[in-house]
């Protein structure tokens, strides 16, 4: 059964505006406390104006446009404005620095960038010094630098009509987004997401938390992440609910925001739960309307019980990754929950635990978590311009190898055991060990390097670097951490450094990481 019915994102927004009209669709709260509200009709008009803006700037169907933005209304306008004209959004993690952002620009073939003043100096350098197809920058801030190839997003948008000027033929199979995600290799891979993927994600995630049009879904997750886009935004809009997008997470402000907007659904990662628990207890801790808290790995039973008891909430566990688009294993609406299980396979999916030879394992045995979906529909289509990487994880019949290990019980409940090889989960961000090692290895004093994740009570894992220096060299912690801060995003910078004479290796010469944890 095709639950999408051939409807692409342009049709979705036109229908939503007709059906829900003046009902509140989007509320955005900035870090400074500025609140913007849009009805479904108003939001569709802003999306149309943004689509027309891109058309005026020469963007056509199939062109790629990068977004380097914090959570803001403009992200939503651009996301769906691009989709309406068949162009492709390339969201960039707002915490990435020049080298990482340049790589994504070059490998996505983005020809236009929408960003804010805080990130502009970095992209000005990229335009001047690095090879890329970037030919124009739109700044969301009102003040503009006196540079060629730069325009004001807001001024240009406000000059556009509220009806769509360019409407090329669209298919649900068309690419809507290329989302670069950290992998076990040295560089991120571009996950190709179609119109069908996003439409399906909306229906599926709305089903997962039994979302209704009178619900209010609040998130502090970054808009460039799949969680915000597919678990929250697409779910809320598909159900005709209200979507509340907060610019940045603050443990002190979170419950006040939940209460102020009368949120009924929200989503949390372990770092949020732990930081909320260290806030001073308040008589208002349970003064909210939350029905469900969508939760993503990984928390102890003691932490879960303490959080649920203090705040009077229950967690709805969901397991997935960028490639699966949604939480393909999770708790089901109205179904029993079995902590610490990550739940059962959702509708439209099959899940198996497989051995190293891709054979299904019986209940209780640990193996790789494998998921079967339909590429380009219920799971990602492919890695952008990377057929070799695609073939490594995605079989022709739709089986996806997650690289994560787990097991299932006799009733079909799945349990997560370990994260995919060489990945560190740090406060909601996936960090590739290999990527960090390649950067740190460029330091002239360092001969050998390995980074590992170690347990952290707040952020799941902290990053520790083990280095071997060149003969006769010395390296201070200050010099090392300064080098890292200059060459990688802040969330990737190691927290600890240990200088060693050598690193443990097996007979093949590979470093034995488990000996360093």
UniProtKB/Swiss-Prot annotation:
It holds the Pfam family AMP-binding_C. InterPro entries: AMP-bd_C, AMP-bd_C_sf, AMP-binding_CS, AMP-dep_synth/lig_dom, ANL_N_sf, CaiC. Its EC number is 6.2.1.48. It is an enzyme of class 6 (ligase). Pathway: Amine and polyamine metabolism; carnitine metabolism. It comes from the Bacteria. Keywords: Ligase. One of its GO terms (molecular function) is carnitine-CoA ligase activity. GO terms for biological process: carnitine metabolic process; fatty acid metabolic process. PROSITE patterns: AMP_BINDING. It catalyses: 4-(trimethylamino)butanoate + ATP + CoA = 4-(trimethylamino)butanoyl-CoA + AMP + diphosphate; crotonobetaine + ATP + CoA = crotonobetainyl-CoA + AMP + diphosphate; (R)-carnitine + ATP + CoA = (R)-carnitinyl-CoA + AMP + diphosphate. Gene3D superfamilies: 3.30.300.30, N-terminal domain of ligase-like (3.40.50.12780). Belongs to the ATP-dependent AMP-binding enzyme family. Catalyzes the transfer of CoA to carnitine, generating the initial carnitinyl-CoA needed for the CaiB reaction cycle. Also has activity toward crotonobetaine and gamma-butyrobetaine. HAMAP family: CaiC (MF_01524). This is Crotonobetaine/carnitine--CoA ligase. It comes from Escherichia coli O81 (strain ED1a).
């Amino acid at each position: 059964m095709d639950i999408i019915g051939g409807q692409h994102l342009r049709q979705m927004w036109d229908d939503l505006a007709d059906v829900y009209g003046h009902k509140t669709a989007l509320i955005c709260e900035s870090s400074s406390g500025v609140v913007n509200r849009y009805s479904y009709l108003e939001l569709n008009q802003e999306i149309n104006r943004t689509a027309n803006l891109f058309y005026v700037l020469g963007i056509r169907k199939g062109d790629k446009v990068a977004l380097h933005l914090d959570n803001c209304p403009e992200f939503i306008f651009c996301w769906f404005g691009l989709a309406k004209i068949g162009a492709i959004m390339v969201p960039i993690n707002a915490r990435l620095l020049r080298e990482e952002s340049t790589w994504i620009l070059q490998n996505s073939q983005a020809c236009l960038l929408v960003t804010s003043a805080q990130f502009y100096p970095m992209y000005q350098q990229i335009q001047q010094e690095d090879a890329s197809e970037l030919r124009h920058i739109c700044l969301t801030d009102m003040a503009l630098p006196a540079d060629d190839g730069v325009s004001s997003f807001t001024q240009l948008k406000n000059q556009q009509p509220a009806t769509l000027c360019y409407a090329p033929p669209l298919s649900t199979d068309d690419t809507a987004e290329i989302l670069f995600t950290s992998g076990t290799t040295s560089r991120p891979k571009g996950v190709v997401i179609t119109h069908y993927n996003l439409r399906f994600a909306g229906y599926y995630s709305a089903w997962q938390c039994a979302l209704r049009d009178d619900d209010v879904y609040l998130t502090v997750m970054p808009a460039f992440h799949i969680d915000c886009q597919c678990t929250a935004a697409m779910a809320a809009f598909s159900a005709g609910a209200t979507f509340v997008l907060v610019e940045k997470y603050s443990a002190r402000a979170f419950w006040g925001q939940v209460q102020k907007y009368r949120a009924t659904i929200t989503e949390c990662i372990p770092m949020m739960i732990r930081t909320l628990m260290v806030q001073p207890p308040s008589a208002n801790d349970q003064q909210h309307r939350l029905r469900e808290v969508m939760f993503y790995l990984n928390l102890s039973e003691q932490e879960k019980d303490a959080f649920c008891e203090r705040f009077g909430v229950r967690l709805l566990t969901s397991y997935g990754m960028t490639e699966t688009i949604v939480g393909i294993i999770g708790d089901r609406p109205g179904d029993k929950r079995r902590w610490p299980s990550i739940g059962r396979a959702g509708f439209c999916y099959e899940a198996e635990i497989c051995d190293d030879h891709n054979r299904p394992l019986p209940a209780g045995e640990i193996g790789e978590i494998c998921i079967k979906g339909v590429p380009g529909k219920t799971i990602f289509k492919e890695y952008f311009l990377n057929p070799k990487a695609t073939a490594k994880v995605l079989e022709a019949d739709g089986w996806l190898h997650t690289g994560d290990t787990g097991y299932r019980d006799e009733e079909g409940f799945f349990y997560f055991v370990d994260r995919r090889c060489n990945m560190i989960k740090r406060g909601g961000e996936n960090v590739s060990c290999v990527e960090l090692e390649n950067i740190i290895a460029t330091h002239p004093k360092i001969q050998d390097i390995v980074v590992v994740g170690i347990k952290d009570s707040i952020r799941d894992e902290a990053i520790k670097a083990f280095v071997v220096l060149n003969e006769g060299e010395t390296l201070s912690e200050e010099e090392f951490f300064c080098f890292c801060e200059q060459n990688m995003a802040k969330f990737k910078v190691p927290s600890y450094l240990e200088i060693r004479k050598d690193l443990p290796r097996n007979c093949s010469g590979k470093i034995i990481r488990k000996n360093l944890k």
